[in-house]
């Protein structure tokens, strides 16, 4: 497919750019429409910056709303809400998206020296703790479990999803 046929644009999320996809923070629950098996996915895109032609972008917005509404009817919320839904769509319809490097969505607290668009820190504008709540301290066992969960468990889930041949059905109807 020619790059001109790609009517939508998404930007890679800086912390996951160039990383093995099994470490991307996709929704892996299997309950949400946004769920992506460990054996699938290539890019992790930021939910805060996307675009495209007017018609294609409006169709994308409608599809994201439809998927989110289906999840809500089933009492499910995707891990990172609309960002998770967008990542599932990128995985399902890769030919529709032009994927830009993270230079177009660089957080101001992580300058790279060649950022094209700088994203401002939320906490400068709103009180994030009042919205999300304060982080709870973790004990030794919780910290070790978190490290295992982030660094080693994805390999086991990848093996499981590969053996079970879990895949994403690719679609061209967005």
Q: Which positions does each model-derived feature cover?
A:
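Short beta-strand-to-loop element that shapes/binds the nucleotide-sugar donor at the catalytic cleft/hinge
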Residues: 7-33
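Polar low-complexity intrinsically disordered regions enriched in Ser/Thr and small residues
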Residues: 5, 21, 33, 51-55, ...
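Short, small-residue-biased leader/transition segments that mark boundaries at the very start
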Residues: 1-3
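Catalytic core and acceptor-binding pocket of nucleotide-sugar-dependent glycosyltransferases
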Residues: 36-126
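C-terminal catalytic/acceptor-binding lobe
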Residues: 88-174
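Generic structural signal of hydrophobic/aromatic residues within well-ordered alpha-helices
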Residues: 34, 61-64, 68, 144, ...
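Positively charged, low-complexity intrinsically disordered regions
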Residues: 5-7, 168
């Amino acid at each position: 497919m020619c790059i001109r046929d790609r009517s939508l644009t998404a930007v890679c999320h800086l912390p996951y750019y160039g990383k093995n996809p099994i470490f991307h923070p996709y929704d892996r629950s299997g309950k949400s429409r946004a769920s992506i098996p460990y054996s699938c996915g290539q890019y992790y895109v930021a939910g805060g910056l996307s675009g495209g032609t007017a018609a294609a972008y409006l169709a994308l917005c409608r599809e994201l709303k439809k998927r989110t509404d289906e999840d809500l009817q089933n009492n499910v919320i995707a891990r990172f809400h609309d960002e998770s839904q967008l990542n599932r769509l990128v995985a399902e319809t890769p030919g529709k998206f032009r994927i830009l490097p993270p230079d177009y969505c660089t957080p101001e607290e992580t300058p790279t020296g060649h950022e094209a668009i700088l994203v401002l820190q939320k906490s400068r504008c709103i009180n994030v703790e009042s919205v999300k709540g304060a982080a709870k301290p973790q004990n030794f066992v919780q910290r070790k479990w978190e490290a295992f969960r982030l660094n080693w468990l994805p390999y086991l889930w990848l093996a499981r999803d590969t053996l079970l041949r879990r895949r994403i059905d690719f679609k061209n109807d967005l």
